[in-house]
Regions:
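Internal alpha/beta core interface subdomains
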Residues: 1-21
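Active-site pocket-lining segments that scaffold enzyme catalytic pockets across diverse folds
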Residues: 30
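Non-catalytic nucleic-acid-binding/docking modules located in mid-to-C-terminal regions
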Residues: 41
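C-terminal subdomains that position terminal phosphate/3'-OH groups for nucleotidyl transfer/ligation
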Residues: 44, 48-191
Length: 191
């Protein structure tokens, strides 16, 4: 840890007040963000942005940055999004993999254990556990999912244990009902 001298701190604060940051490209901001997320002390970067008044325009919605520093840069980003109501990516141009992971984490966060089956099935289809199994397993390890982690693990395991390949052989008119039945069975087994 180190401390800025007063003159340096004042100079940095004046940059934030001058709107100079508005003229930086989203790509440049992403490069700095990627470096910060790769750091073993990523939270210090965000803490400094806030304390030095450098959040506008790129991080104006950041309010929390309690990160598990042992996580990968991708998972640190997801932690930030989860803690800040998925509002950070709106002003940034993120790589596709970060956008997809953000969307997947948003879908997982939206799952409610007490939700009615129809809504839950819609959400489960969007998550696509078969295609996104590895990413789902990474995301649900995050502290944010502590209260529903067991349920999500059961749900994932029960869905993955079903043989959805039978849908390819089913008559088109029966396919949707059969798929829905597989999801309903998985949901019931997970409660």
């Amino acid at each position: 840890d180190f401390a800025l001298d007063k003159t340096t701190e004042e100079s940095i604060r004046s940059i934030g007040k001058s709107n100079e940051l508005n003229h930086l490209s989203a790509d440049r901001i992403w490069m700095e963000l990627r470096t910060a997320l790769s750091s073993p002390r990523s939270a210090n970067f965000f803490s400094s942005l806030v304390s030095l008044g450098l959040t506008d325009p790129w991080f104006s919605k950041i309010s929390s940055f309690d990160l598990d520093e042992s996580n990968s840069p991708r998972l640190k980003w997801i932690e930030l999004e989860l803690q800040n109501n998925f509002s950070l990516h709106e002003s940034l141009e993120l790589p596709k993999e970060f956008i997809e992971l953000t969307n997947l984490s948003f879908q997982l966060a939206a799952i409610d254990i007490e939700e009615d089956q129809e809504n839950l099935i819609d959400k489960l289809e969007k998550i696509n556990f078969h295609r996104n199994q590895k990413e789902v397993e990474e995301i649900i390890k995050l502290k944010f999912f502590e209260n529903k982690r067991d349920y999500l693990i059961k749900l994932k395991d029960n869905i993955l244990s079903k043989d959805f390949s039978i849908l390819g052989e089913a008559p088109k008119e029966d396919m949707m009902k059969m798929k829905k039945d597989l999801y309903i069975e998985s949901i019931k087994e997970s409660k």
